[in-house]
């Protein structure tokens, strides 16, 4: 080799070899010092075929797992079916299931629904019965919706109201007939509803709000019981009493006019006696007030006040 200035040296190669060997020793020592106990050895050579195959299989399994996780249940099922047919043979028709016996939630509720649930019905609850009971609990069971299409045959259909009907006022502020939406002249009726459910005959008292035409349909064969509020009954009683008092006053006035013709002396005496009697009654009532404590008045509870308020609201 040529050195600087064109001079050759016989010791230049030996010096370079010594420096490279020292560097290798230093790197090996540094690697040993920096090596961690769980660290694997570095392969300076080409890996064995078996090791390379294991690494490839592991990487492919990881990718496949991520791919399956990204799928939903249906896509995963179709992939497995296609892989099975691809590797083991067969037809896709063998994997098709018959949908004749499939049931939706609505079918399950129709099969297990009950108009009224008793304690006996809630025994031995299956998932179908639990679903029907959950639907029943969400219904509003104050007023019913009626189907009066077969009223001439004395056949009626009743069901409870759902949330939308309660919000819209159907069955309470509008006619409770399924095919009628009138809101004038509504009357409340109480009907003894007899029905057969799951092979068992049952009865239930049902309240309905119907217009005049639908009330005629309901009472086509025999009249049902009409529900009236307490205040209306009290008003009718008061009206009857007032009319009877008016009649008695008129009759007394007529008799008094007849007696006036007979003589004024007797009328004066009667007036004096009436005035004396009224004065005596007033004095007696005043004396009775101071004899003892005031009579106790029955105070209504909060529940009774709420009941009266809701009766005026609903009827």
From Swiss-Prot:
List the GO biological process terms. mRNA splicing, via spliceosome
Residue ranges of the region described as Disordered: 1-28, 226-315
Which residues, renumbered to this chain, carry the PTM Phosphoserine? Answer: 9, 12, 251-252, 278, 283, 285
Tell me the protein's name. Protein FRA10AC1
Lineage, highest ranks first: Eukaryota, Metazoa, Chordata, Craniata, Vertebrata
- Sample GO molecular function, one term: phosphatase activity
Name any GO cellular component annotation.
nucleus
Which residues does UniProt call coiled coil? none
């Amino acid at each position: 080799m040529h050195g600087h200035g064109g001079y050759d040296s016989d010791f230049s190669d030996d010096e370079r070899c010594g420096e490279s060997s020292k560097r290798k020793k230093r790197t090996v020592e540094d690697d040993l010092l920096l090596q961690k106990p769980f660290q694997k050895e570095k392969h300076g050579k080409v890996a064995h075929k078996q090791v390379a195959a294991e690494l490839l299989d592991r990487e492919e399994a990881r990718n496949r797992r991520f791919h399956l996780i990204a799928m939903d249940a249906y896509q995963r099922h179709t992939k497995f079916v296609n892989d099975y047919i691809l590797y083991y043979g067969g037809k896709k028709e063998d994997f098709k299931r018959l949908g004749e016996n499939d049931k939706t939630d609505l079918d399950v509720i129709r099969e297990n629904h009950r108009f009224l649930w008793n304690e006996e019905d809630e025994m031995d609850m299956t998932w179908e019965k639990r679903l029907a009971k959950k639907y029943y609990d969400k219904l509003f069971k104050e007023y019913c919706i009626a189907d009066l299409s077969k009223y001439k045959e004395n056949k009626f259909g009743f069901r409870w109201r759902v949330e939308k009907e309660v919000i819209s006022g159907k069955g309470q502020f509008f006619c409770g007939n399924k095919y009628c939406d009138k809101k004038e002249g509504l009357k409340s009726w109480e009907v003894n509803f007899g029905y057969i459910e799951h092979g068992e005959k049952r009865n239930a008292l049902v309240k309905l709000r119907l217009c005049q035409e639908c009330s005629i349909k309901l009472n086509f064969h025999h009249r049902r019981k009409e529900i009236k509020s307490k205040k209306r009954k009290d008003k009718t009683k008061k009206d009857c009493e007032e009319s009877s008092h008016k009649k008695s006053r008129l009759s007394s006035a007529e008799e008094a006019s007849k007696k006036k013709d007979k003589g004024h002396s007797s009328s004066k005496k009667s007036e004096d006696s009436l005035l004396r009697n009224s004065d005596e009654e007033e004095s007696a009532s005043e004396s009775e007030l101071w004899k003892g404590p005031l009579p106790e008045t029955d105070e209504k509870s909060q529940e009774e006040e709420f009941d009266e308020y809701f009766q005026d609201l609903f009827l």
